[in-house]
Amino acid sequence: MSFNNTGKVWSVDAFAQYLKTIKPPAWAKAVCLHHTSSPTLNQRPNGFLAQHLENLKDYYSRQLGWHGAPHLFIDEDQAWGMNPLTETGVHASSFNRLAIGIEVLGDYDNEEPTKGRGLQCWQTATAITKLLLDWLSLPVNDKTVLFHRDDPKTTKTCPGGKVGKAWVINLIKNSSVPKTEPVSVSFSALVPELEKKGYSSEEIKKGLKISNGKVYWRDKWLEKAYYDKYTQTTFASTEEINLIEQNQ
């Protein structure tokens, strides 16, 4: 157990590619879902930032004396790493040795998981869960999708009283899992590449849009592009960048 993935962050597409670079662990037989409870959605209006994960790491390691942590933290559009996926973590007493632990941003005893930002967080979490179960060659059912409250050693409602198992399983089964490109696909920071093509800062501001996690250039969807909140950088594949032509 360790905190070696702290500082890593992935979009759903990037996470799919990342999983292709590591070997599924034999111990993992399920995914266990949690909610952060605190912080709430209101306390993190812009989702997680890198410093938030560093603070959590410090809390787990120094204040609680843990040698590991949950594996992933999910906000509206990204997965933030902490415990390596190949190592058992610390998140639910009965499930630590058999499940990958995921913390979903929000307090779903009081906040709403079926609309707004809450729904966005759960859509991202269930897409990530589907990728993990596929990676582990596991089916989607109530034995592979665990809630913290399923642990007989806890009295918590986690991942929140408003979150139902059947609803989550349905989201997982119907999640839009990306068709992953080979790991060798090359990505570059989009803005510097547009500047090299001769676009001015003003043209880039007008032409580059990000909506619902999708990146658009002059209303054209760049399917492989994504915005990384950790570095505050938009990345696009070299292929897509090369197809961009400056309109005279």
Question: Model-predicted segments: where are they?
Answer:
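Acidic, low-complexity, intrinsically disordered interaction modules
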Residues: 207-235
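Basic/polar, cationic surfaces and motifs that engage anionic cell-wall
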Residues: 1-36, 43, 76-79, 84-88, ...
